[in-house]
């Protein structure tokens, strides 16, 4: 199974697969679509996974930029969060998170497309909740993230 999705127009998901789950009836809003707050929660968890790996420890979400809800998610859709590190500062990490779905319970079966994207900013914190410096030495996750950032087109 391919880790990245490609839609019918050839657009491909960006970054690494962070989280994969199933949209359930308990996650719906009053219209019967999946609730935007649930989607945002999944994105925050997925982005935090990547940020924690880079920061080598605890992180907190401090900002969410440009949240775009592109298409609704239906009950039964496979929901996949992809993350891509955009920037690493002294204690902060910016992660772009895209949510893609794969239709498995409704038409058109098998179709994949992007439904939401946003940029999350996380800050590395110590056990007292104070910001801390992201370790630079012996940090393979940071090295991988920085290498991918340098490869991104402007």
From Swiss-Prot:
GO terms for biological process: acyl-CoA metabolic process; fatty acid catabolic process. One of its GO terms (cellular component) is cytoplasm. Pfam families: 4HBT. One of its GO terms (molecular function) is long-chain fatty acyl-CoA hydrolase activity. Residues 13-128 form the HotDog ACOT-type domain. Belongs to the acyl coenzyme A hydrolase family. This is Uncharacterized acyl-CoA thioester hydrolase HI_0827.
């Amino acid at each position: 199974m391919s880790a990245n999705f490609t839609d019918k127009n050839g657009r491909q998901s960006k970054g690494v697969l962070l989280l994969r789950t199933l949209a359930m009836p308990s996650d719906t809003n009053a219209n019967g679509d999946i609730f935007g707050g649930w989607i945002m929660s999944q994105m925050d968890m997925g982005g935090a996974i990547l940020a924690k790996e880079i920061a080598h420890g605890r992180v907190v979400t401090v900002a969410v930029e440009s949240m775009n809800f592109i298409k609704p998610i239906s009950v039964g859709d496979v929901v996949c969060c992809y993350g891509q590190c955009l920037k690493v500062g002294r204690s902060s990490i910016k992660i772009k998170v895209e949510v893609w779905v794969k239709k498995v319970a409704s038409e058109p079966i098998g179709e994949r497309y992007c439904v939401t994207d946003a940029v999350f900013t996380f800050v590395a914190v110590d056990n007292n909740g104070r910001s801390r410096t992201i370790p630079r030495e012996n940090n393979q996750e940071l090295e991988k993230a920085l290498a991918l950032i340098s490869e991104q087109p402007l």
